[in-house]
């Protein structure tokens, strides 16, 4: 296994995709991971993110807002979305350029993004809509492209260390 220190902080969505490929290559799955697994992981992470926002669906609970935890959960969504894009582009027919270009105009997003809408787009295989809504949600939550790239890099390094220890 390569050490995480051989890699550098991502600066683009394409860098995230490449780091995700490396992470996924090193993780030993108990069975082949299929698109349905990745979609379910994304849905789980979207719900975890929602639970960390100021407007969680858990209206019956009071929980102190933690911006760092919210960003970490948002970054987890990007991890699994990168995994999904890599999975879909394995045969070369799924074009990643759109996603790389959209990430570059990250701060320009302004539209409504709702968690259930994200889930519907994912289930309907509307990955472009999902990604646009994810970028919009990121902005609405007050995060920048650098916030996502920095958090992704930190968490990627931790995940690489977890391989073979916490993750068997």
Residue ranges and their predicted role:
Residues 1-168:
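Flexible "arm" and connector segments at domain edges
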